[in-house]
Every structure is written in structure tokens, then in C-alpha cells.
């Protein structure tokens, strides 16, 4: 019985070696050695910013008119950029003109501050320094 266990162990080692060899060959088939390197054109390249206080980097560069127009266009408000609203949130306040002409003489909607004798008396007391505003 002990001999059989030894034989099983040897068969397992051979079998393991065969599995490892197959894995190694499969990896070698899938591997590709890259010797030429290039930048991926589909990926955005991050630029390295210069130091603002260095004198050698602050040389005058020609203005890019297209880039300046793009910056000025982005800084404008949405009403100047677009003829119509782009989102539902922009619909509120897009047209600031009132729908009806407000009549300031109509007392149904306009409640202006009106001074009578009692309100003038209390306002005078408050201006003189009376502390109890609640009474």
C-alpha cells in the first residue's frame, strides 16, 4: 500500500509539471514584446504648468485668437450664448419682462406704507429711544 502512495505522489508531480508547462507555454503565446513606444492619440495629455514666478518661463507668447474667443464665449451668460433655454432651470427668469404692466396705482396688489396719527406717534417714540417695541 505504501508503494502505491509513492507512485501516486510521483504521478501527481508529473501531472503538476505538465500543467505548469502548459500554463507557461500559453503565457508565452499571449505575451507580446513592445519595443516601440508612442503616445495614445485617443487619451488626453495633461500639460505641465509652468512656475508663475520664474523669469525664463514668462516669455511673451503670441495670442491665440481662437482660444481667446472661446474663453470669452464661455464667460458670457446663457442668454447671450443661446437663443433659447437649454435646461428647465433656465426657463425661470429667462424672460425678465413682466407678463402684465404693473399698475402702481392699483391698491388691490400694492400695499404701500401708510402713515396715520398713531403710527407717526409711535415712530416718534421709537426715534427718541423708547425700548419697548412690543407694546
From Swiss-Prot:
The gene is Cfap144. Keywords: Cell projection, Cilium, Cytoplasm, Cytoskeleton, Flagellum. Residues 76-100 are annotated as: Disordered. GO terms for cellular component: axonemal B tubule inner sheath; centrosome; ciliary basal body; ciliary base; sperm flagellum. It comes from the Eukaryota. Belongs to the CFAP144 family. PANTHER family: PROTEIN FAM183B. This is Cilia- and flagella-associated protein 144. It is found in: Cytoplasm, Cytoskeleton, Cilium axoneme; Cytoplasm, Cytoskeleton, Flagellum axoneme. It comes from Mus musculus. Microtubule inner protein component of sperm flagellar doublet microtubules.
Amino acid at each position: 500500500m505504501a508503494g502505491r502512495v509513492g507512485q501516486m505522489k510521483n504521478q501527481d508531480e508529473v501531472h503538476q509539471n505538465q500543467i505548469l508547462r502548459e500554463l507557461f507555454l500559453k503565457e508565452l503565446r499571449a505575451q507580446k514584446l513592445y519595443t516601440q513606444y508612442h503616445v495614445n492619440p485617443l487619451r488626453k495629455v495633461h500639460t505641465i504648468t509652468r512656475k508663475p514666478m520664474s523669469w525664463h518661463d514668462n516669455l511673451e507668447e503670441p495670442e491665440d485668437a481662437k482660444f481667446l474667443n472661446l474663453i470669452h464665449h464661455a464667460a458670457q451668460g446663457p442668454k447671450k450664448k443661446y437663443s433659447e433655454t437649454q435646461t428647465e432651470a433656465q426657463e425661470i427668469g429667462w424672460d425678465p419682462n413682466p407678463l402684465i404692466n404693473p399698475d402702481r396705482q392699483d391698491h388691490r396688489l400694492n400695499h404701500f406704507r401708510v402713515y396715520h396719527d398713531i403710527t407717526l406717534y409711535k415712530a416718534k417714540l421709537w426715534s427718541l429711544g423708547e425700548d419697548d417695541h412690543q407694546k
